[in-house]
Protein backbone atom coordinates (compact mmCIF):
# COMPACT_ATOMS: atom_id res chain seq x y z
CA UNK A 1 0.00 0.00 0.00
CA UNK A 2 2.81 2.40 0.91
CA UNK A 3 4.49 1.61 -2.38
CA UNK A 4 1.30 2.49 -4.34
CA UNK A 5 0.97 5.80 -2.52
CA UNK A 6 4.62 6.57 -3.11
CA UNK A 7 4.28 5.70 -6.81
CA UNK A 8 1.15 7.86 -7.07
CA UNK A 9 2.90 10.84 -5.46
CA UNK A 10 5.96 10.36 -7.63
CA UNK A 11 3.83 10.12 -10.77
CA UNK A 12 1.89 13.24 -9.75
CA UNK A 13 5.08 15.24 -9.30
CA UNK A 14 6.38 14.05 -12.66
CA UNK A 15 3.16 15.19 -14.35
CA UNK A 16 3.31 18.57 -12.60
CA UNK A 17 6.97 19.10 -13.51
CA UNK A 18 6.38 18.06 -17.11
CA UNK A 19 3.42 20.41 -17.40
CA UNK A 20 5.39 23.26 -15.87
CA UNK A 21 8.29 22.63 -18.25
CA UNK A 22 5.97 22.66 -21.26
CA UNK A 23 4.29 25.88 -20.13
CA UNK A 24 7.61 27.59 -19.44
CA UNK A 25 9.02 26.54 -22.83
CA UNK A 26 6.05 28.12 -24.62
CA UNK A 27 6.35 31.47 -22.89
CA UNK A 28 7.85 34.31 -24.89
CA UNK A 29 11.59 34.50 -24.36
CA UNK A 30 12.75 37.30 -22.09
CA UNK A 31 14.13 40.40 -23.70
CA UNK A 32 17.60 39.35 -24.70
CA UNK A 33 20.40 40.88 -26.60
CA UNK A 34 20.51 39.05 -29.90
CA UNK A 35 24.11 38.12 -30.42
CA UNK A 36 25.36 34.77 -31.57
CA UNK A 37 29.08 35.38 -31.41
CA UNK A 38 29.60 37.62 -28.42
CA UNK A 39 33.15 38.69 -29.21
CA UNK A 40 32.24 39.95 -32.66
CA UNK A 41 30.75 43.30 -31.65
CA UNK A 42 34.20 44.93 -31.74
CA UNK A 43 34.90 43.49 -35.17
CA UNK A 44 31.54 44.42 -36.67
CA UNK A 45 30.81 47.75 -34.98
CA UNK A 46 32.40 49.75 -37.80
CA UNK A 47 30.69 47.89 -40.64
CA UNK A 48 28.59 50.19 -42.75
CA UNK A 49 25.19 48.86 -43.75
CA UNK A 50 25.30 48.01 -47.43
CA UNK A 51 24.64 45.03 -49.67
CA UNK A 52 28.20 43.73 -49.59
CA UNK A 53 28.45 43.86 -45.81
CA UNK A 54 24.97 42.43 -45.27
CA UNK A 55 25.85 39.45 -47.47
CA UNK A 56 29.15 39.01 -45.61
CA UNK A 57 27.50 39.15 -42.17
CA UNK A 58 24.77 36.72 -43.26
CA UNK A 59 27.41 34.30 -44.51
CA UNK A 60 29.50 34.78 -41.36
CA UNK A 61 26.52 33.87 -39.18
CA UNK A 62 25.71 30.91 -41.45
CA UNK A 63 22.34 32.28 -42.54
CA UNK A 64 20.88 29.51 -44.69
CA UNK A 65 19.82 31.77 -47.57
CA UNK A 66 22.01 34.88 -47.29
CA UNK A 67 20.94 36.33 -50.65
CA UNK A 68 17.23 36.07 -49.85
CA UNK A 69 17.73 37.47 -46.35
CA UNK A 70 19.82 40.33 -47.77
CA UNK A 71 17.06 41.03 -50.29
CA UNK A 72 14.57 41.12 -47.42
CA UNK A 73 16.75 43.61 -45.56
CA UNK A 74 17.02 45.82 -48.63
CA UNK A 75 13.26 45.79 -49.15
CA UNK A 76 12.32 46.22 -45.49
CA UNK A 77 14.83 49.01 -44.85
CA UNK A 78 14.44 50.82 -48.17
CA UNK A 79 18.04 50.02 -49.04
CA UNK A 80 19.20 50.82 -45.47
CA UNK A 81 17.71 54.32 -45.62
CA UNK A 82 14.37 54.00 -43.77
CA UNK A 83 13.69 55.82 -40.51
CA UNK A 84 13.18 52.46 -38.78
CA UNK A 85 16.60 51.35 -39.90
CA UNK A 86 18.30 54.60 -38.96
CA UNK A 87 16.67 54.89 -35.53
CA UNK A 88 16.43 51.22 -34.54
CA UNK A 89 19.23 49.53 -36.54
CA UNK A 90 16.49 47.13 -37.65
CA UNK A 91 16.86 46.26 -41.35
CA UNK A 92 14.22 43.50 -41.23
CA UNK A 93 11.36 45.34 -39.57
CA UNK A 94 11.37 42.82 -36.71
CA UNK A 95 8.47 43.66 -34.42
CA UNK A 96 8.22 43.09 -30.67
CA UNK A 97 4.53 42.33 -30.15
CA UNK A 98 5.06 42.23 -26.38
CA UNK A 99 6.18 45.88 -26.32
CA UNK A 100 4.07 46.90 -29.33
CA UNK A 101 7.11 48.43 -30.99
CA UNK A 102 9.92 47.40 -33.28
CA UNK A 103 13.01 45.77 -31.85
CA UNK A 104 15.82 48.24 -31.36
CA UNK A 105 19.37 46.98 -31.83
CA UNK A 106 22.71 48.45 -30.82
CA UNK A 107 24.05 47.73 -34.30
CA UNK A 108 22.46 46.46 -37.49
CA UNK A 109 24.58 43.29 -37.35
CA UNK A 110 22.77 42.34 -34.12
CA UNK A 111 19.55 42.32 -36.15
CA UNK A 112 21.00 39.54 -38.32
CA UNK A 113 21.49 37.40 -35.21
CA UNK A 114 17.94 38.29 -34.14
CA UNK A 115 16.58 37.30 -37.56
CA UNK A 116 18.16 33.88 -37.10
CA UNK A 117 16.65 33.57 -33.61
CA UNK A 118 13.21 34.86 -34.51
CA UNK A 119 12.59 33.83 -38.12
CA UNK A 120 15.10 31.42 -39.59
CA UNK A 121 15.08 29.00 -36.64
CA UNK A 122 11.57 27.96 -37.76
CA UNK A 123 12.82 26.96 -41.21
CA UNK A 124 12.85 23.18 -41.62
CA UNK A 125 14.26 23.04 -45.15
CA UNK A 126 12.86 23.20 -48.64
CA UNK A 127 11.82 26.28 -50.58
CA UNK A 128 12.71 29.32 -48.48
CA UNK A 129 10.31 31.56 -50.38
CA UNK A 130 7.45 29.19 -49.57
CA UNK A 131 8.56 29.24 -45.95
CA UNK A 132 8.41 33.06 -45.96
CA UNK A 133 4.97 33.02 -47.57
CA UNK A 134 3.65 30.85 -44.76
CA UNK A 135 4.93 33.20 -42.05
CA UNK A 136 2.87 36.20 -41.05
CA UNK A 137 5.93 38.29 -41.91
CA UNK A 138 4.84 40.85 -44.48
CA UNK A 139 1.58 42.62 -45.10
CA UNK A 140 2.31 43.37 -48.76
CA UNK A 141 0.74 40.71 -51.01
CA UNK A 142 3.63 41.20 -53.48
CA UNK A 143 6.33 40.88 -50.81
CA UNK A 144 7.79 37.60 -52.10
CA UNK A 145 7.81 38.86 -55.71
CA UNK A 146 9.65 41.99 -54.62
CA UNK A 147 12.21 39.99 -52.63
CA UNK A 148 12.79 37.72 -55.65
CA UNK A 149 13.41 40.70 -57.92
CA UNK A 150 15.86 42.27 -55.47
CA UNK A 151 17.66 38.95 -54.99
CA UNK A 152 18.01 38.49 -58.74
CA UNK A 153 19.74 41.89 -58.96
CA UNK A 154 22.25 41.27 -56.16
CA UNK A 155 25.90 40.96 -57.14
CA UNK A 156 27.13 37.38 -57.56
Model-derived features: positions:
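Catalytic cores of secreted/periplasmic lytic hydrolases that degrade extracellular macromolecules
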Residues: 2-156
